[in-house]
From Swiss-Prot:
Keyword field: Amino-acid biosynthesis, Arginine biosynthesis, Cobalt, Cytoplasm, Hydrolase, Metal-binding, Zinc
Cofactor binding: number and manner: Binds 2 Zn(2+) or Co(2+) ions per subunit.
Cofactor annotation: Zn(2+); Co(2+); glutathione
Gene from which this protein is expressed: argE
Identification of the protein by name: Acetylornithine deacetylase
Enzyme superclass (EC): hydrolase
Species the sequence originates in: Myxococcus xanthus
HAMAP family assigned: ArgE
Amino acid sequence: MSDTLPALRATLTELVAMDTTSFRPNVPLIDYAQARLEAAGFSAERQKFLDDAGVEKVNLVAVKGGSGSGRAALALVGHSDCVPYDAAWTDALRLTEKDGRLYARGACDTKGFIACALHAALNAEQLKAPLMVVLTADEEVGLTGAKKLVEAGLGRARHAIVGEPTRLIPVRANKGYCLAEVEVRGKEGHSAYPDSGASAIFRAGRFLQRLEHLALTVLREDLDEGFQPPFTTVNVGVIQGGKAKNVIPGACRFVVEWRPIPGQPPERVSQLLETIRQELVRDEPAFEAQIRVVRTDRGVNTRADAEVVRFLAEASGNAPETVSFGTEAPQMTELGAEAVVFGPGDIRVAHQTGEYVPVEDLVRCEAVLARAVAHFCGGR
């Protein structure tokens, strides 16, 4: 299929063999990438941090023709971590090929892109403008690594191609991703004597009823027709409460997830949650609920006529689209880039047992990234 395929396959084989599940260190992969990039003339800067469990994580910013603190012409951005895999998938860390597909955990999300980015960077010569390769940690558990880069001002570029499995379709906009945990309190008692307690589950039901009403009305007033659906969505995917069938529940907890359209403050739903709480307290002074906002990651909407959008559309042959899942593009935008999400594979097979990337996607992606390097950095 291509002279580049054997080398791409070899690199991807090495990348997937390193278990970079988010709860593990990603240091081996960073060491591997840094060694190869430095051997090709890149200068590398590492940003170390500990995750909530005290596990060491590392972001890598490698530049050819500049420094990590400066602004590159183009950044190729990929996250090094993967979601966990089922123990029954015994070949999860061994790249296997069948019917034109390369199978392994991370092959699609996003080590396939990293392999392509590394090869496009390693083969770049005579650069006239700085090229940057950015590898982040802990994207799968809150975009933590990308947020650390923003805090430190590392990874600045004029244009950024953020790796995700988009089927080689340029994605110029994505919704944000936000989470809040709500705990509603009641009073335990014997279920045979309702007046002896106050049901936290019934109280939570009243809270959720109001939330659903707002999700179906107020949050559908702001529209962005570039998305499907074109409004901010709300979901309550987890709820827990009660101890036994004959005990009035004293507590009920649920998790609210919302995906704001770009331009809408990500805090809007958390403000609505607080409004609901206050209204319920007004109606029932004994009502008690605590709201803990966990994440408020905004979306991004890169201009349709931005140079990087137009280039990727032409180079890939695919019209730009939008997606409703979160990416690291907003963080790259905060660092000053016009960012587009792009990469081999399909998000619908990511995070699954039997995750794969099509061989053809891998080869085409590397070719597009190589063209991007030549276009934005003037190399060959």
